Amino acid sequence: MKIVVDKNIPYLKEALERAGHCVTAMPGTAICKSDVADADALFVRTRTRCGRELLEGTGVRFIGTATIGYDHIDAEYCKEKGITWCNAPGCNAGAVLQYVQSVIYARYENVEGLSLGVVGVGEVGSRVAEWAEAAGMKVYRNDPPKAAAGMLGLVSLEEIAEKCDIITFHPTLVRDGRYPSWHLAGEAFFASLRHKPLVINASRGPVVDGKELLAALERGMVSAAALDVWEGEPDIDRDLLDRAWVATPHIAGYSLEGKYNATRMVLDAFAAFAGNGGIAMPCLPGVENPLLAVGCERDALLGIYNPMHDTSALKNSPCDFENQRNNYALRREVTAYEIVVKG
């Protein structure tokens, strides 16, 4: 088959070529209709919007997005045209968990007794909540769609605003319908805060209204903001960037393990679509120094990944957002190391 792929999806081009396919790799932001005119399949990330404008009149019959989110895929159009598509749910949940852990530990030496609000308890949010409880935090979970489906133990967003020292956002981006998450954290949310929380957004930029967050920071309603995602990426609000405590270029999910998982998932879906056997991928490499001797979990997590380094890079060169994201040196997750706690 003729296949067009985003060149920044690791292992993908090589795996498809070894399976006998004709593959063209290019930047995701550059993919246009002429590139996919005679393609049978398309593999993308969030930067490639897949709808009528790109796909009308082309030969594309399969789209794989190597991401958890899929708001860049026009599902209705694909259904209308009989185009099969897949995403990679949960592929980088471990990486985003690692990011949130490192952000929290960079802010607090001791997390026991803190209250954490988790907005959205899907693959990522549920793992964040489980870790936080194990670390001794009081956790409040919010997820209206899951509450409507019968999940117990959930609270309102208002209760989280009233009770939490840290609030982290992990919902799917939904623009309309019964449970929209677009600007979920808006003027009313920030006005109802009671504990001047640390606010973390590693989901989608528009989940948090950037202008209202900036106003809340300026008024002291929010003590600090840790932002990995931004409205208008890659052209981000410079004033909000200046006020953000942690500011990274949409790389919370960028671990080698997460990228590997995503590629594996979309390849499996493509193989099922094409009616072929599985497509082989190489094993993940080991790390150079896998043994970590540390005093506590905090030391281990910040030793593996400290978000302040990426923050410095983005604040020093905000115009370089997309380049920093596309050329990010994929970090490794905790599972790649053997951790020994001293004493």
What are these regions (language model features)?
Residues 97-113, 134-135, 264-273:
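Oxidoreductase and adenylate-handling cofactor-binding alpha/beta cores
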Residues 112-115, 196:
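Phosphate-coordination loops involved in phosphoryl transfer and adenosine-cofactor binding
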Residues 196, 202-343:
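Rossmann-like dinucleotide-binding domain for NAD(H)/NADP(H)
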Residues 50-51, 146-238:
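Rossmann-like adenosine-cofactor binding region
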